[in-house]
Amino acid sequence: FLQTGFSAHGSAFDEMHEVIANSTRYLTAEDMTALSTFLLGDNPPAPQPLPAAVSPDSGTGNGAGTLDAGRGHYMALCASCHGSEGLGRSLTMPPLKGNSTVRQADARNLVLAILVGLPKHPATQQGPTPLPGMPGFMQELTDGEVAALANYTRTALGGQPADVTAAQVADLRSAAGKSGHKAAP
């Protein structure tokens, strides 16, 4: 991940993308091992199993109708790259099923990825195929539509509750515009 910005669990976003593009992708194998050992320790934690999908009524009252709308947005905007089941495409598009961003209890990074997109990942020696960026949908989707898409993705692919609200999306949309979060080119 630290050399390519891409793993089975997700892809680098925002500041981490810059760290990889401008720094860690140039590390030698020895330096990468040392850095990984420093970050994870000598005995890194075992991977955690993916939680089961939660029911549409979990969370803050976003019911099945909202999740159906979110599924519609997912199929229209996301499935062509990430697949209808969220499995991605090997080495070119990350899976969303089990993706660490989708599995986080705090949906902030997922909502920001939907709003502003993700940058391209350049080719590296370890990952010679450059990966395309993900477009942001800040201009195309309302706050309610982003919340519905995030909630569908979280429940169906990440085992998280449907607890993203339009008000939370509005706050993140405003903050993204002020903070310098960059839309994908």
Would you name each region that the model predicts?
Residues 62-91, 98-116, 182:
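Sequence/structural segment immediately N-terminal to covalent heme-attachment motifs in c-type
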Residues 1, 12, 81, 95, ...:
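Sparse, context-dependent recognition of short Cys/His-centered cofactor- or disulfide-binding micro-motifs
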Residues 3, 21, 40, 82-88, ...:
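Detector for the c-type heme attachment site
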